[in-house]
Regions:
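Short catalytic-loop micro-motif centered on adjacent basic/acidic residues
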Residues: 185
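Accessory nucleic acid-recognition modules appended to NTPase machines
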Residues: 2-177, 181-182
Length: 185
């Protein structure tokens, strides 16, 4: 930070991600946890209704990896947001574990994951990101920030989808949180 060199910061974040991935091997030695984590930016940028496990791990299904997702959530490296089929004050009553979204618990690491295909993320990328000049939709970065902040305040996170009149597309409420005797979108 004192050098204003984001590349040095990026390398430190890559080292942290490597440690996470090493720990994911302890959770699941098949590599599924690592694959799920690495796919978070791609999953969110698709703007899909849920985390599509089969796109992150070929021929895998939610039912077979749910224990891995729970372990990742318990490790506090990810924030998992579950679909609430009927959002009332008892959101957990209609929690649908087959439909979830996954966010990183650290948005800085999320940004590095998004550019992980390069050996290092150049200062110019961080400069453009900080000055809102990056030519990409950053909505998913902001979504990750909100998930991180809400979880840091102790909120349990849910989301809800509502079909359009035609039923083929959905409106989505990204975060539905219980707030005493009511819910807040």
């Amino acid at each position: 930070i004192t050098t204003n060199n984001f590349m040095a910061v990026d390398q430190a974040k890559r080292d942290i991600i490597a440690l996470y991935e090493e720990d994911f091997g302890k959770i699941d030695d098949s590599g599924r946890a690592k694959a799920l984590y690495d796919a978070i930016p791609a999953q969110l940028s698709r703007n899909a209704m849920r985390y599509q496990v089969g796109k992150a791990i070929e021929e895998e299904r939610v039912s077979r990896i749910m224990n891995v997702v729970k372990e990742m959530e318990d490790s506090m490296t990810v924030n998992v947001v579950y679909h609430s089929d009927d959002p009332n004050t008892g959101l957990a009553l209609t929690k649908n574990e087959d439909y979830f979204k996954m966010y990183t618990s650290d948005t800085g690491l999320f940004v590095t994951l998004a550019f992980k295909d390069n050996k290092i993320t150049e200062n110019i990328i961080y400069d453009k990101l900080l000055n809102d000049k990056l030519s990409t939709n950053l909505g998913y970065v902001y979504e990750n920030v909100i998930a991180q902040v809400l979880r840091a305040t102790g909120k349990n996170l849910f989301y809800h989808t509502i079909p359009y009149a035609e039923g083929k597309k959905y409106y989505e409420i990204d975060f539905v949180i219980p707030d005493r005797h009511k819910i807040s979108p």
